[in-house]
Every structure is written in structure tokens, then in C-alpha cells.
Amino acid sequence: RVMSNITDTDGKVVSAVIRVGRNGDYENLDALVMDATNNLIDEVYQDDPKLVAIVGRKLLADKYFPLVNKPQENSEALAADIIISQKRIGNLPAVRVPYFPANAVLVTTLENLSIYFMDESHRRSIDENPKKDRVENYESMNIDYVVEAYAAGCLLENITLGDFTA
């Protein structure tokens, strides 16, 4: 359930990236996320009210920057502030995650993502290092990040925003 390029009905790659913008594969991020929700997520999960669009800071900024990057009347500035404060992409709440890839969107529920810790895997060693006048702490732990139900989510990657007029 990963969309990283655009293919035709025969499965032939039309575009190596997902082009979002004028004359692209999608006109805006909202259309891309709505299409992915309707076609890549199993029908059972499509209407789940807990679905969110997990994005990095850059995609969110690229969506909302044009709203604020122009001189505006007070009423228009207030409307832009309200739109930005809602942070929605494709009619889903947008969740900004640090260190998430800049050109990707993950559509799923937050409950579908889990962290597992292996029992008794936490290892720790504390060494005193008088040569450097410090105490050195070494720690390691076996941690696994899991998507519980692949049918309840999809990943959109290789998203390129721009104007694709020839």
C-alpha cells in the first residue's frame, strides 16, 4: 500500500514521482490524499473517523505558505489563520511529525502505529573516565516500530510540488 510513482492502467510507469501542482498528476495535496484514502486503504477503514495524514514540516508549510505570503486585509488574514489552525489535508487532520520524510504522507490511524520493547533487552553500562573528567553512560535496547494493520493505512512518497506546465 505504497504509492511512490504514477502508473497507467497497464502498470507502465507514467511518472517516477508523484507530481502535485498545475498540470501535475494531482492539482493539490488534498486531492492526492483523498484519492489515496479512497483507493489504497481497505474499504472497512476508509470511513474511520480516527484517520490522520502524518506529514513532515515541509509539506505542511508548502500547503499553507501561499495563504500567508501575500498582503491581506484583516478579515482575509483572520480567515487564513483559521484555515491554518485546523491543519487538514485531504479532509483528514494533519499530524506533523519530526524527522518524517519531507516528501511523504502516511495515512492511517495513530492507534495503528505501535512501539514494542523486547523484554530484558535493556542494557546499560556506566564507566567512570577520570582522564576526561566525566562519567560515560552506554545504553541499548531492542525496540521495534510496527504498523499493526497494513490494510488500514497507506504511504505516499516521492511527492514533488510545483508547476508542471511544459
Give each language-model segment a name.
Residues 8, 58-62, 149:
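Short, catalytically relevant binding-site loops at active-site mouths
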Residues 10-15, 19, 23, 66-166:
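Sequence/fold signature of self-assembling virion shell proteins
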